Amino acid sequence: EELYSLTKAMVATGPRLKFPGIVADKHSAGGVAGTRTTMIVVPIIAAAGYTIPKTSTRAITSPAGTAYTMEVVATVTFTTTQITRIVEKVGGCIVWGGHVGLAPADDILIQVERPLAFESYDKIIVSVMAKKIASGANHLVLDLPVGPTMKIQHFKDAELMSRKFMMLGKRFKMKIVVDINETRQNAGRGIGPVLEARDVFEVLEQAPERPLALEAKALRLSGKLLSLCFADTPGKKDLDGEETARELLLSGKALAKMREIIRAQGGHPDVLSNKLTP
């Protein structure tokens, strides 16, 4: 009840985004640098025809959050009105949540956490749920990496967090699928915004030298989220989420969608992985 009340109160401290129908989202508890799956998952989900307004942090406990990495190729600071316009036009976005002001009480707490490089488990749960509710999400995939150097170091803790996420999901009418995975190293090759962006585009371009571990994780998360969305989409209940995600990646549709998102966010849509150098 305390988690529910705190989440509800944090959502009420700022504006909310609203979109019709299925609104997908993804979050990773993080703790490992160089694993920038969001920038692969978002264009895959949007290419599948689902709305995915992704708001991300710049960084809390790693060198480069998703917002920093996306900022290499596009603007990430927008108002709620601008975000709504972008998402209505191209189906998705990858923007900095701190500028939007969704659940702003959380951003104040993040300023405390950053110098400590620490987040409590319950704070992670409340923070994630408040942001997702404020962004209008109703279908969510959660990535909970577990390992000796992760924010979550024991599987029993991840399982407890998963149960709490599911409980809050029911209270707020949000469908959630949780991916608990053992993580001992980064899935990509680069550390830092430019190199992590290069990893992302190597996967989207299907470059021969792309980081396969990053691709595999992004496809797994995309697949779980698509399956969750398909279950509530007439005529798509029997489709395989991960197989669909792979088809969208291999066909180039995910890359094309990413270029649409970059263009809509004022960036250079013709960016290539081999041009991304520090």
Regions found by a protein language model. Name each.
Residues 39-53, 72, 131-136, 171-172, ...:
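Alpha-helix C-terminal capping segments
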Residues 90-139:
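Phosphate/diphosphate-binding glycine-rich loops and adjacent basic-rich segments that engage nucleotide
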Residues 9-28, 86-111:
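Self-splicing inteins and homing endonuclease
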